[in-house]
């Protein structure tokens, strides 16, 4: 969707509008804390599986999305269009090697 929409908006508005996406990995926050951690702070089975599949071996902190977002909103990324930026500690690329 991001790529298609970027092309559509470029055809309509030229370089006045950019369409990009942030693709967050697993960030520990209130909405998923019980799914990923036990009451004592240890990982649930699912949380442990996520950690084992993430090269950084930790969950992200929601504040770690800020840098990518600020860059996408800045003049430093004016030629960036139709891309999805993964902020996931390597989760989507890790094959368990």
Residue ranges and their predicted role:
Residues 1-9, 22, 72:
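Hydrophobic alpha-helix immediately C-terminal to the catalytic Tyr-X-X-X-Lys motif of short-chain
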Residues 70, 81-97:
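Short C-terminal tail/terminal secondary-structure segment
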Residues 7-12, 78:
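Alpha-helical segment proximal to the catalytic Tyr-Lys
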Residues 66-77:
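Alpha-helical substrate-binding/gating segment
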């Amino acid at each position: 969707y991001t790529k298609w929409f970027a092309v559509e908006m470029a055809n309509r508005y030229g370089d006045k509008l950019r369409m990009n996406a942030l693709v967050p990995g697993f960030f520990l926050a209130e909405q998923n804390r019980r799914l990923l951690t036990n009451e004592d702070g240890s990982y649930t089975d699912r949380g442990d599986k996520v950690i084992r599949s993430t090269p950084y071996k930790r969950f992200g902190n929601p504040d770690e999305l800020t840098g990518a977002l600020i860059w996408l909103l800045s003049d430093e990324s004016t030629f960036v269009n139709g891309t999805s930026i993964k902020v996931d500690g390597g989760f989507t690329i890790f094959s368990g090697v």
